[in-house]
Amino acid sequence: MTINEILQAARKRAEQMNLPYGGALTPQEAAEVWRNAPGAKLVDVRTRAEWDYVGHIPGAVEIELLTYPGNRPNSAFVSELERQVDKQAPVMFICRSGARSHNAALLALQAGYATSYNVLEGFEGDRDASGHRNTVGGWRAAGLPWTQG
């Protein structure tokens, strides 16, 4: 698929899911857009503890949406985003499973990022039948680049 076809599919998903922002991407689609769309950024909105103990995506912009400990909203989220990401470029948000990144995409839209996207499944994906993550969906299970520690 071309970048335009991927973004059209993401927009169609957003319409089906009644999402107000640019679209919803699978991890594989997000990686393709990030690699090939001029200026595209992947923003990881997990906590510092998650980056440190679960893993990083090399080259991703890291801005906590909620701070750890306590899961309090990061009052500087939008200003940090504006400092690091061009409002005209595609910006994709990823978290553990897709919930916080949805909220980040909403905040970005409100801040003037018209092409903001949520990465479905997130970094770790959903839990499997045994209650474990990283086996069903997600960035890691898709075999996309990440490092630990």
Q: Can you describe what each PLM-predicted range is?
A:
Residues F93-I94:
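Short, surface-exposed ligand- or partner-binding patches at beta-edge/loop junctions that are enriched
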Residues D44, G98:
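Conserved G/P- and acidic residue-centered "switch" motifs that form tight phosphate/ATP-binding loops
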